[in-house]
Amino acid sequence: MAPSQLPPIFNPTPQDIEMLLAAQCHLGSKNLQVHMEPYLWKTRPDGVNVINIGKTWEKILLAARIIAAIENPADICVISARPYGQRAVLKFASHTGATAIAGRFTPGNFTNYITRSFKEPRLIIVTDPRTDAQAIKEASYVNIPVIALCDTDSPTEFVDVAIPTNNKGRHAIGLIWWLLAREVLRLRGTLATRETEWDVVVDLYFYRDPEAEENKEIADEAKVPGAEEIGAGAVESGFAGENWDTQAPGAGVPGTAFSAATAAPTSWEADGGDWAASSAAPAGESWAETQPAEAKW
């Protein structure tokens, strides 16, 4: 890391440097574009170009100052056709108030005023100059400044501010957008001091594969054992080992009244009496006397 020309207050913390290295923001490609040579630190024996992350940090601060100088945040357009950067630009837009274009860039967005999606931004920020070439080309037609995340092999034509970084890894892209958003909020005063921690974690800016998330949920559901896995015999033995009649009778336990009633079977011949005798009318008593008097309406 080269000596920084920034004031001491803007120097990165050790945690920031560790995050940049852990996300592999310093690993470029094996090709080198001539305009990206000033940001090169060294070339590894395997041919991979290593980016100077000190220059990366300086360009993040420069880009944040440009973004914070625009009064209306909606006049800033953040673009990413690369899938790894689409979640990051949407999160950046939600935290800073910018306008996000995630996915395919419709030709004519900046030049054809007849289209419904026509926009007139004051600044655009792109994730990759190669995949977002259409947006950069149209911005050059209407004099819109361009900030871009550039790898060592990225074309820098019509790019005004290049942030040297690895723009192909999902962690590197998400981290750069997160650092840029945090720095913009610091300059705007949303974060009181530079020592104030931002409560938004960097993981929210990382790309997540929908299919992988769905497969993970299916795998978690498959971990719950069913009757097919533990066997029908184990289920039956589990039920057989329990005594269902040992529960104390209680009002709140369903089935206790039924268990008590069926515990001792009733013998219908226990009395040994005559059913006809029990249903016969008492001696000296007439049916007419026992019938109730008719009501008179």
Swiss-Prot record:
Subunit structure: Component of the small ribosomal subunit. Mature ribosomes consist of a small (40S) and a large (60S) subunit. The 40S subunit contains about 33 different proteins and 1 molecule of RNA (18S). The 60S subunit contains about 49 different proteins and 3 molecules of RNA (25S, 5.8S and 5S). Interacts with rps21.
Annotated keywords: Cytoplasm, Ribonucleoprotein, Ribosomal protein
InterPro entries named in the record: Ribosomal_uS2, Ribosomal_uS2_C, Ribosomal_uS2_CS, Ribosomal_uS2_euk, Ribosomal_uS2_euk/arc, Ribosomal_uS2_flav_dom_sf
Function: Required for the assembly and/or stability of the 40S ribosomal subunit. Required for the processing of the 20S rRNA-precursor to mature 18S rRNA in a late step of the maturation of 40S ribosomal subunits.
Family the entry assigns: Belongs to the universal ribosomal protein uS2 family.
Keyword hit for Ribosomal protein: yes
PROSITE patterns: RIBOSOMAL_S2_2 (PS00963)
Matches recorded under HAMAP family: Ribosomal_S2_euk
Pfam families (alphabetical): 40S_SA_C, Ribosomal_S2
Compositionally biased region (Low complexity): 256-289
GO terms, biological process: cytoplasmic translation; ribosomal small subunit assembly
Superkingdom classification of source: Eukaryota
The protein, known as: Small ribosomal subunit protein uS2
Lineage: Eukaryota, Fungi, Dikarya, Ascomycota, Pezizomycotina
UniProt-recorded Gene Ontology molecular function terms: structural constituent of ribosome
Cellular localisation: Cytoplasm
Species in which this protein is naturally found: Aspergillus fumigatus (strain ATCC MYA-4609 / CBS 101355 / FGSC A1100 / Af293)
Region Disordered, annotated ranges: 252-297
GO cellular component terms listed in the entry, alphabetical order: cytosolic small ribosomal subunit
